[in-house]
């Protein structure tokens, strides 16, 4: 029986040997079978460990992938905050902003005595972070500590290990460049993360949001001028009102976008104030006199934006009213764009059963069942963006209100939503401009028909026959389905000649 069991075990081992297994080499055991039998049971696990290195934080050792520059604290964060997946990672603009900040801090720290060799390596590695060359080494999600400490350490570890590599050292050794002692020198997560937030927000506003809104403003302004001589009926409460020009109607949209740009720019001076130098609670512990001012100046030079040190670091760490203010300006912008997009799609409704005063560009098929149907898709996309921005602002508002004592602890969520709003509004403004606004045409035949049929032209008679008689004309004409002119003459309130003289749409476009 024992012999049978041994034979069975041997046959099972033989079945596990791959056909391509190499023959015995010098000094090897006599067969592939014996090599397999002699291999320790955890050999596969040990072999897989070759792709990892061991790093340490204050809680102990962790395995870190050899192809990543981050370290133990980043790995621990990925273990502790498995929330949302890849789509919820810290926004890349924040990571790039950290690269700018860490470079500036290293340069200033060198002025205060940091070894130039270490400082230069940090600066080079930080530049790579700022340029987006190391994006794959930042796996952390937004949903972490409210101060952003894990992301600050992720940045410190990546820059440290990349700098170590540049200097020919061993990844994970923290020598000669230490993530805390050197990369994070004179800094705390409590002041670096809000600094990165402001840098990221300012860059996004200048690179995406303001250019997009300016493009939309200019296109709407061009349409306002193009439509300046087209007289149409106005509408209030969605009901017919007195005339105006299509150009005047569009001029309202132009002014809304102009004010949106003005509001956003007005919020920026507070965004340009940087918390760097406040360290843990705003006192500047472990920094040198002048560090905060010098870092802000370096960041300004690196970005070309007028950053300055925050005049009060306690406010800069504990409250993020500046981000709430900027988000509020974007929320107002979203309200404006919602109105503009809705007006344009309603004025373009039809083509035969709607208002039909505007002819909108036809960009793609609109229905999977109704042949030939085309929809106002750019308007719909813009209104959805507006709704999202409004929702983002609610989250930012709640986050901004949660500054507890010396620290706000909703930082990652706040900047995620601020950046999301800025990017969405900027991109949507460009898309709406290029794919809708520039191609809008006026349907003058339809506009003239609706204007001539409107009962509200009777308003021009008020100064001549009084409100009550004018109202009687309008109501009688509506009830009988007759024209204003015929009804006015029939009621004996005026002659046909008087009606033609007093009721002229072109004379109803402004004060006299």
From Swiss-Prot:
Substrate binds at residues 147-149, 178-181, 188-190, 236, 368, 373-375. GO terms for molecular function: fumarate hydratase activity. The modification Phosphothreonine is found at residues 87, 238. Residues 17-36 are annotated as: Disordered. Pathway: Carbohydrate metabolism; tricarboxylic acid cycle; (S)-malate from fumarate: step 1/1. Catalyzes the reversible stereospecific interconversion of fumarate to L-malate. Experiments in different species have demonstrated that specific isoforms of this protein act in defined pathways and favor one direction over the other. The modification N6-succinyllysine is found at residues 63, 68, 82, 117, 124, 294, 469, 475. Gene3D superfamilies: Fumarase/aspartase (C-terminal domain), Fumarase/aspartase (Central domain), Fumarase/aspartase (N-terminal domain). Homotetramer. Interacts with H2AZ1. There are 2 substrate-binding sites: the catalytic A site, and the non-catalytic B site that may play a role in the transfer of substrate or product between the active site and the solvent. Alternatively, the B site may bind allosteric effectors. Keywords: Acetylation, Chromosome, Cytoplasm, DNA damage, DNA repair, Lyase, Mitochondrion, Nucleus, Phosphoprotein, Transit peptide, Tricarboxylic acid cycle. The modification Phosphoserine is found at residue 368. InterPro entries: Fum_hydII, Fumarase/histidase_N, Fumarase_C_C, Fumarate_lyase_CS, Fumarate_lyase_fam, Fumarate_lyase_N, L-Aspartase-like. Its EC number is 4.2.1.2. Residues 1-46 form a transit peptide. Belongs to the class-II fumarase/aspartase family. Fumarase subfamily. The record marks 380 as: Important for catalytic activity. It comes from Sus scrofa. The active site is at 237 (proton donor/acceptor), 367. One of its GO terms (biological process) is arginine metabolic process. It is an enzyme of class 4 (lyase). This is Fumarate hydratase, mitochondrial.
